[in-house]
């Protein structure tokens, strides 16, 4: 995956050769490959970027055979606009948005005409509140956004440790604006908004990576959307900040 990006940035064929060597290796797609299941596609995650590598190979080579590996997989996954795509019970929104990101990149670059944008739009709509729970899984975005993100530093939680039993929500707590929580554990939107349920309410950088990537892809396609003035920090030019009871320490340096 890194080799693919480096080739696009430098046009150094060394990286292209490296990418193709791995993608076309005889053991590609077999379990147990160096412990990482190389080439066994899944939504992009911290543990597996094989799908992203395949998309980059298709973009770089333009070969129909390279793209077919991607579209064959996506066709099996991105096939229902009415059912929430749930790859795993832990952090399902992370996998869902990561799949959207991959599908949108394929829709943009694949020469076969494969188009998954409508599926992605439907999935994103579910994540942002169009679901049986009427829950928006992006913290701080709307009045129906989840509140109990599993995040000690900024959760709206009244205690510094969720295991102490102090589970009351504090309106004076910090809000982790824009964070994508794990989400439902199945396609039926089984979900509980509690900080103690890390499968449903955990947050992480790789969760938001898919969210931002998918949102960018959808905007690139549909060119619609606006900044909601009710979201904290969007009414003016000041960034979203969290505050403490103590004044922050400001360090200055002499200008050079």
Language model segments and positions:
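Aromatic (Trp/Tyr) and acidic
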Residues: 1-14, 18-25, 45-80, 89-240
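Solenoid-like repeat scaffolds
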Residues: 24-29, 36-43
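Acidic/His metal-coordination segments adjacent to aromatic residues that form catalytic metal sites
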Residues: 30-34, 77-86
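Extracellular mucin-like PTS domains
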Residues: 241-256
